[in-house]
Amino acid sequence: LKGMPEPLIEDEIRRVLGLVNLSENLDDKIKSFSGGMKQRLAIAQTILNSPEILIFDEPSAGLDPFEREQFKRIMVRLKKDSIIIISTHIVSDIDTITDDLIILNKGSVIANDSPEALFEHIRGMVWDIPKEDIGLLPIENIYYEDTKSKTISKTKPTPNAVISEPTMNDLYFCGQLDGGVFE
């Protein structure tokens, strides 16, 4: 914005604040902003100069569900004009706002495809999750625990059940607990 006439600077600031749903807060003190508003303000600062490539690291971390939905709508709008690279562990962000998904393990690319293709690839896979990691799963994803093989399954009583209809949460939690394969 350096060198831009002041009226144009104000217009650009208003435009960017509008993109992140903060137009009404132009004169508010940042101290009064919620965590989600501060996150959206950070996004606004990032896009102010209309960069061709935007890189975000865990941009929706710490947002409540409502703010996360607002964030997704903002990202969908932004990806029309910019290339967006997002590092995230929040799988609901992936299926909503990404066209391509790259899965890294210790800095190496182990998968690169659309979220839908990768999701289809995991359909029917057996997930063995170490017993010590079971407590990290959301309780609604645990239907059966086999203490002998130290695995969990979605059906009862098969020790190594096949996930026939996995959700993105299955991908996330299984990936989260498999020693970093899907990180």
Label the predicted regions.
Residues I43:
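Hydrophobic anchor residue at the start of the ABC signature
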Residues E140-E183:
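C-terminal coupling/interaction segments
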Residues L8-N25:
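Conserved ABC ATPase "signature" region
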Residues K29-F33:
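Conserved ABC ATPase signature
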Residues L54-E58:
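Catalytic Walker B motif of ABC-type/P-loop ATPase nucleotide-binding domains
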Residues P65-E67:
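Helix N-cap at the start of a conserved alpha-helix in ABC-type nucleotide-binding domains
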Residues Q70-T151:
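ABC transporter nucleotide-binding domain
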